[in-house]
Amino acid sequence: MNSIGNISTQVTTFASHGATSAWVLAENFLIIVVLMVVMLGFSYRSGRGGIVSLIVAFYGGYSLYTVFPYTNDIIGAGGSPLVKAIISVIIFAIATFIPYHFIQRLVGGGFGVLSFMPRFVLSFLAATFLLALAYHLFHVSNIYTFPDTINHLFAPDGYFFWWFVAPLIGLIFFVH
């Protein structure tokens, strides 16, 4: 009977440790999961080529954001880091919407229907692209403390390039 109690204790310990580890993992990557679900929903809502248009528009928005001569002046007008982050996100959203509007018209009919897996991967890559921009362009880490796991993946400047090109690599593999 003692061995059955011992096995029961081991199983309970394993299950609770596994559940705790799964919860911590989910909590650490919740921001990526939320952004990915939003991107996935957008890809289904926007029709054929919507996620492709959005990813390409992100690059156009990034370009417009960085070359706009008044970006720093407008962001500097915000007093607190929170207001500065909100202003920079709004500027990026406007700079992304302009190319998206035209790219969607050009790309919309050019692609067949993407299956779930390409949409899932492209949504994940778009979400990580936005999170990398949040770290390096919008400085969201000044107003929100991300979990260490996310900080290790997105905070180093050397990783920004890889998160930046990841959606393009995804487009190369999944859109043909």
Q: What annotation goes with each model-predicted range?
A:
Residues 2-176:
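Alpha-helical transmembrane segments and their juxtamembrane interface "caps"
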